[in-house]
Every structure is written in structure tokens, then in C-alpha cells.
């Protein structure tokens, strides 16, 4: 047998070799196979329950993919970008420079009710003095947008609106070198160009971009000049440790066409009342981020960041009823008002996440510290030139207001995620804020000793949330979280000698509460949420007379409000065949926001506003869309409806002579966007905004950029070419 075995092996190997030779000498003709399909688009997802050092379990949230959208990205069209987020109120009047948005009946001005972040880095200009975000992100540089409602606020801040986090693109990990170019042109002489470069050098990744955009406006005397730059360098010495250096800058100069009265708007919404007004923010955001995966169950993140920049404003600041014309005597224009804010905001944030087991259940605890040191230097009421161009030089070196608003605040936060069963988990959290804001400086028309000098912020904030998985892809979730909002710099500055500030004035505070049902069933995706938003210590003005019978106004906390509503997101899709897909969705919010108590000055009288509706809270915001996909082509139709709402707390129906107050009429807008992906390297986008040329406005601002009607854009279109190498 031993002698036979080698012989058998030889025969087997020899036959195998011979068979291979025979096969190699034969040629087989195979039928061709065509693989057909439709390019998959999953624009909206939910955040993972545990993501990085954050706990999102039990929170209302959205995760939006910008790279898959049929939307106007270069002009930051918020109603298209956030179309699948129920109840997003869009205040669109600034030519694509800023996204003014809010949810749940809050103020949309530059997103200042949100904790605004880019890659986890705070981009609110000054969280305590002026929380508006003046940094203008080129959305071509953004991969996706994360949005978390206010019930998750304990982990990142105390804002009523919640958090918006823009997640940037990075270098393509599959390539040593990558390049992107996103060029757009369109109506109103739109020209936009975005270029990015990425590289991978073993342990180092680099991504950098340049963006430029020029655009005239829908209205006369409206123009935008914009540019932005950014660079990101990531060094990963090990797979568990990374150090990230990031610098981003944005600049834009916007020529404002001025407010209109209602009669002007209905006669011709494209006309302007100003030709010499300008707005110019220049913002720098440097940061360093350290991420360390200490063990499979432990993560740490440290961020040191700053926001440094200026906000320049040049205005002939009068109502629309007063013309900005040449004086017949001097044969010159009147002097313009110059205002300059200088932001110096610094944030240090340490976060830690620990996973631990209790029996067979996995639990997580997240905690950290946040230190903010801000100095907002505000110079206002400067006497500017009589020129028509952008010129921030003063003809008189004395500012009407020259003030510093310095804040130092520290916050400690912790949140624990407990798995009670495999399907049911509870989160319990707390945040403690302690700090102080100090105001000092001069106001030429006001005694120095009567300016409020110190405001303390000390708040213990509590919250809880839960999630219960009914089935694999369905869950009930809910939560409650306390919130607060610091008083803004502008609310503490008396506008005249006849105005006084309550020395016991308080920050606004309240809570968010919600309960929802979300998931997927066959071809249907859904998320339905009921919410309450309590907003106490709202700020306003009262009228009084002193002992000598002199009239004066008094700025103080005037009352409380409650907004309640339902947010509905429904989306269904059907594969008609291998290459055709149809998607329809509805994204709506039904809201009722009212003052539960309050008194406000009207003329020389104080009026009770209890039961009145809150400003800029429409009863219904609804967006409905349909997308048809064929192979690599898609076309999307979006219908947006916003119900009428009030511009002031008195619920004034008839417009005032200046257009500053009155009902904001309901409006509906239709947008069409298409995308054609030629191959992996080349893509075309064509869009028409406001297809039916609806003439509308979304808000009557009571302060900047001027009281009155600010028309939104009429019909306009754009073509974009996207090249990726």
C-alpha cells in the first residue's frame, strides 16, 4: 500500500495537469450580461443611538445627505435643503448668504436659537452676546447635516432650538489625491465656483477648498460678493488617536436694497428703497480637535476653538417711507450710520464616553466640561460718510456707543443611557451652567452709572428621554429637557435717554418636551412627533411715568409663552422596475404658539397680550415632494406652503404705514431640480426656484436689517457642473 500511494498521487496530478492544459486551449463564448439599476438615494436618515461621544438615543433628529440631494446647494436654498425636516421656518431674504431657519415657533434670525456647529466646532458668533451665526459655510464643502431637537441640548448647550452640525467632506481615503470642482451659473448674473483638493499621505490627510460667488439680486440695488476658504489637516499616529487642525474663513459683502411698504411690495417687489446700505461679516474659525479611543469601551474628545471676526454694517437706517435722497441744500446724501461688532469667542470642550455592562445589558455614560470666554466689542451709531460705496470710515471719530460685553461661562454635563431591556432604554442627564457677563463702556446719550454692569448665569438643567423598540425598525421615543437663553447684548442697551433697563432682568428659560413614533414598514418611512415648547421670561418693553410725571420706557421680562404642535414626516417609494423609482413625501408641522401671560408697551400704554399668538409662528408649514429616478437621472418637484402669521405680539392685522407690523400673508412656492450623473467623475444639476413666480415675503423684521417688507426671490434658475477626480 505504501508503494501504491505515490503512484496514485502521480496519476492524479498528471491527469489534473493534462485537464488544465486542455481547458486552457479552449475558448468559450459567453453571453453578455447587462446589470440594470437605479442610483440609490437615501437623503434622510436618523443618527445612531451612540455616535462618537454623543448619546442620540431617544432624541428627535435628522441626518441629511447633501451630496444626494436634488437641491440648490450653491445658493443655500434652505426650504429645499431642509425640505424633509418638518416645521422648518425659513426667513429667506439675503441672496443665499445665510440660512435663517428655526423650528417649533422660534426666531429664525441667522439660526440664533440653535447651537450651530461645523464638525463639532461652535460657529455661533457669541453665544452670550449675539448668538447669530455670521459664518457663511460653502455648502459644496459639506457632506451631511445633523439636526437634533432641543431635548438633546444637555450634551452641547442649553439652546431652545437644539443643535445643527455641518459635517465637512474629507480627503477620499481610497485615493492618494482627489479633486472636486463645483461650478454654477444662473439668474441674476450668478457665477459660483468651488474647488477642493484632498490627499492621503499614510498617517496624514489634508483637505482644502476655495469658494467664490458673485450674484446680483432679484431686487434693484442688490448684490453679493462672497468668498470662503478652508483647510483641514488630520494626523493619526495610531488607529486609536487622531489630531485634527482646521481653519475656515468666510467673507461676504451684501448690498441691501432696503425695506418696502406693503403698497410698494404689491406694486413692484423688485424695487429698492436704498442703494447705499451694506452688510459685511468677516469670520475666522480656527480649531484643534483631539480624538482618542482609549479602549474598545472608552472614548475621549477635546476641542479648542475660536471664532474671531467682524460684522460691519453701513445703513441709512430709516423706515421705507423716508427716501434716501440728495439734500437740496447741501447737494449731498445724508450721512450713513456705521456699526461694527468685533467677535472674540473662545471655547474649550472636553467630552468623554464610557460603555459599561450591567448583567447582559449595555449602558453608556457621556460627560464633559465646556468653557467659554467671549469678548464682544460693539461700536455703534458712528457717523459715516455721505458716499454710495462700501466705506466704514467715520467722519467723526466718536462712536455713539462703544461697549464691551465680556462673558466667562463654564458648564458641566453628564448623561447616562440605561438599557432596561433589549428593547427599552432610558436616558437621564443634567447640565450645570455658571458664569457671568459684564457690560462696560460708554453711551453718549446715557449716564454711565445706569448701564447694567453684570448679569450672572447660574442654571441647573435636567432632562430625560427614552426609546422603546416595538419591532426591529419601529420605535416610540420621547423626552423632556430644561433650556435657557441668555439675554442678548442688544436687549440690554437703552435706545434713548427715555429708556431704562430693569436691573433685575433675567435670562429666558423653559423646556422642550416631545413624544414620537418613527420607523420603516415595507416601502414607508415615517416619523410623527408631538411637542411642547415652554418659553418663560420673554423680553419686552413697558411704558411708565416717574414721580415727576415724565414718560419713560422700561425693558424687562414681560411674560411667558407656550408652543404646542405635531411634526409629521411620511415618505414612500416604489421601484416601478429595475431602472425606475418613484419617491413621494410629506413633511409638515401643525403649531399653535401663544402667550400664556404678558404685558407689552403700545404707545404710552401697557397692553395685556395673554392669549395672543407668538410672532412668526404659522399654524401650518407643509412641504410635499415627488422624485422620479431613471438610472442615473433624477427630477424632483417640491411644493412648500407656509400659513399666515403675525409680525408682532399685539397680532396687528392691518399693515402699518411703514410695513413694520401687520399680517404676513400665507404663501406657496414650487421648485424643480434635476440631477444627471454621467459617470463617477461628472454630474450636472439644473434647478428652477419659485417656478410659479410667487410674489411673497416670509417675515417683517422689527430690527436689523430694517423694519418693513423684505421680498423673497421670484422665479430664478441655475445650472451646476460637478467634476470629481
Question: What spans do the regions from the language model cover?
Answer:
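Short acidic/polar hinge/loop motifs at secondary-structure boundaries
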Residues: 89, 121-149
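Surface-exposed extracellular loop regions of Gram-negative outer-membrane beta-barrel proteins
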Residues: 253-268, 377, 436-443, 454, ...
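Face-selective signature of the C-terminal outer-membrane beta-barrel domain
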Residues: 239-248, 281-319, 323, 327-442, ...
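Outer membrane beta-barrel strand-and-loop segments of large Gram-negative receptors
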Residues: 149, 329-351, 502-506, 512, ...
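Transmembrane beta-barrel wall of Gram-negative outer-membrane proteins
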Residues: 185-214, 219-255, 278-298, 431
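Gram-negative outer-membrane beta-barrel transporters
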Residues: 352, 422, 530-534, 552-650, ...
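A beta-strand signature from Gram-negative outer-membrane beta-barrel systems
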Residues: 137-180
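Conserved C-terminal beta-signal and adjacent last beta-strands/turns
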Residues: 248, 478, 582-590, 610-725
Amino acid at each position: 500500500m505504501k508503494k501504491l500511494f505515490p503512484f496514485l498521487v502521480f496519476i492524479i496530478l498528471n491527469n489534473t495537469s493534462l485537464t488544465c492544459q486542455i481547458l486552457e486551449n479552449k475558448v468559450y463564448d459567453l453571453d453578455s450580461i447587462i446589470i440594470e439599476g437605479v442610483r440609490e438615494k437615501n437623503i434622510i436618515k436618523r443618527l445612531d443611538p451612540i455616535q462618537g461621544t454623543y448619546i442620540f438615543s431617544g432624541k428627535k433628529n435628522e441626518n441629511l445627505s447633501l451630496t444626494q440631494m436634488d437641491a440648490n446647494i450653491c445658493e443655500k436654498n434652505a426650504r429645499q435643503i431642509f425640505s424633509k425636516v418638518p416645521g422648518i421656518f425659513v426667513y429667506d431674504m439675503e441672496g443665499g448668504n445665510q440660512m435663517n431657519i428655526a423650528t417649533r415657533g422660534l426666531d429664525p434670525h441667522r439660526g440664533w436659537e440653535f447651537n450651530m456647529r461645523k464638525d463639532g466646532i461652535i460657529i455661533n458668533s457669541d453665544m452670550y452676546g449675539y448668538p447669530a451665526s455670521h459664518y457663511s459655510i460653502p455648502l459644496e464643502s459639506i457632506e451631511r447635516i445633523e439636526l437634533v431637537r432641543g431635548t438633546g441640548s444637555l450634551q452641547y448647550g442649553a439652546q431652545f432650538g437644539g443643535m445643527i452640525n455641518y459635517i465637512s467632506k474629507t480627503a477620499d481615503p481610497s485615493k492618494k489625491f482627489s479633486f472636486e470642482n463645483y461650478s454654477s451659473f444662473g439668474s441674476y448674473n450668478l457665477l459660483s465656483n468651488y474647488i477642493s483638493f484632498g490627499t492621503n499621505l499614510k498617517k496624514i490627510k489634508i483637505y482644502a477648498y476655495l469658494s467664490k460667488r458673485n450674484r446680483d439680486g432679484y431686487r434693484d440695488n442688490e448684490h453679493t460678493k462672497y468668498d470662503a476658504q478652508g483647510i483641514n489637516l488630520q494626523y493619526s499616529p495610531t488607529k486609536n488617536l487622531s489630531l485634527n487642525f482646521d481653519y475656515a474663513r468666510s467673507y461676504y459683502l451684501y448690498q441691501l436694497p432696503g425695506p418696502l411698504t406693503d403698497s410698494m411690495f404689491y406694486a413692484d417687489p423688485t424695487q429698492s428703497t436704498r442703494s447705499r446700505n451694506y452688510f459685511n461679516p468677516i469670520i475666522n474659525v480656527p480649531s484643534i480637535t483631539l480624538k482618542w479611543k482609549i479602549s474598545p469601551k472608552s472614548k475621549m474628545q477635546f476641542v479648542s476653538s475660536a471664532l474671531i471676526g467682524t460684522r460691519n454694517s453701513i445703513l441709512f437706517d430709516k423706515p421705507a417711507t423716508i427716501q434716501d435722497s440728495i439734500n437740496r441744500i447741501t447737494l449731498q446724501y445724508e450721512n450713513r450710520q456705521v456699526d461694527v461688532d468685533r467677535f472674540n469667542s473662545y471655547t474649550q470642550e472636553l467630552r468623554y464616553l464610557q460603555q459599561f455592562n450591567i448583567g447582559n445589558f449595555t449602558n453608556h455614560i457621556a460627560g464633559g466640561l465646556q468653557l467659554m470666554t467671549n469678548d464682544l466689542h460693539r461700536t455703534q451709531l458712528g457717523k459715516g460718510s455721505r458716499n454710495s460705496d462700501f466705506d466704514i470710515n467715520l467722519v467723526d471719530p466718536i462712536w455713539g456707543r462703544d461697549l464691551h460685553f465680556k462673558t466667562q461661562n463654564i458648564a458641566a454635563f453628564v448623561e447616562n443611557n440605561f438599557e432596561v431591556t433589549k428593547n427599552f432604554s432610558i436616558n437621564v442627564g443634567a447640565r450645570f451652567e455658571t458664569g457671568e457677563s459684564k457690560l462696560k463702556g460708554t453711551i453718549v446719550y446715557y449716564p454711565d452709572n445706569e448701564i447694567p454692569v453684570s448679569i450672572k448665569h447660574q442654571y441647573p438643567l435636567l432632562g430625560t428621554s427614552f426609546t422603546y423598540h416595538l419591532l426591529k425598525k419601529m420605535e416610540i421615543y420621547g423626552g423632556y429637557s430644561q433650556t435657557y437663553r441668555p439675554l442678548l447684548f442688544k436687549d440690554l442697551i437703552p435706545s434713548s435717554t427715555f429708556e431704562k433697563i430693569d436691573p433685575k432682568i433675567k435670562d429666558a428659560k423653559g423646556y422642550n418636551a416631545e413624544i414620537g413614533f418613527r420607523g420603516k414598514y415595507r416601502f414607508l418611512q415615517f416619523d410623527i412627533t408631538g411637542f411642547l415648547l415652554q418659553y418663560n421670561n420673554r423680553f419686552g418693553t413697558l411704558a411708565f411715568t416717574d414721580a415727576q410725571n415724565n414718560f419713560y420706557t422700561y425693558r424687562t421680562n414681560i411674560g411667558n409663552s407656550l408652543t404646542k404642535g405635531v411634526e409629521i414626516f411620511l415618505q414612500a417609494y416604489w421601484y416601478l422596475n429595475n431602472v425606475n423609482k418613484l419617491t413621494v413625501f410629506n413633511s409638515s408641522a401643525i403649531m399653535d404658539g401663544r402667550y400664556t401671560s404678558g404685558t407689552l408697551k403700545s404707545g404710552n400704554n401697557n397692553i395685556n397680550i395673554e392669549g395672543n399668538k407668538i410672532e412668526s409662528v404659522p399654524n401650518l408649514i407643509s412641504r410635499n415632494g415627488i422624485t422620479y429616478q431613471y438610472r442615473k437621472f433624477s427630477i424632483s418637484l417640491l411644493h412648500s406652503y407656509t400659513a399666515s402669521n403675525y409680525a408682532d405680539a399685539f397680532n396687528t392685522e392691518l399693515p402699518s404705514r411703514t410695513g413694520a407690523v401687520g399680517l404676513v400673508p400665507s404663501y406657496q412656492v414650487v421648485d424643480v431640480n434635476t440631477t444627471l450623473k454621467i459617470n463617477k467623475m461628472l454630474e450636472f444639476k439644473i434647478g428652477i426656484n419659485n417656478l410659479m413666480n410667487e410674489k411673497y415675503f416670509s417675515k417683517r423684521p422689527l430690527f436689523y436689517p430694517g423694519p418693513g417688507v423684505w421680498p423673497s426671490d421670484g422665479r430664478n434658475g441655475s445650472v451646476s457642473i460637478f467634476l470629481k477626480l
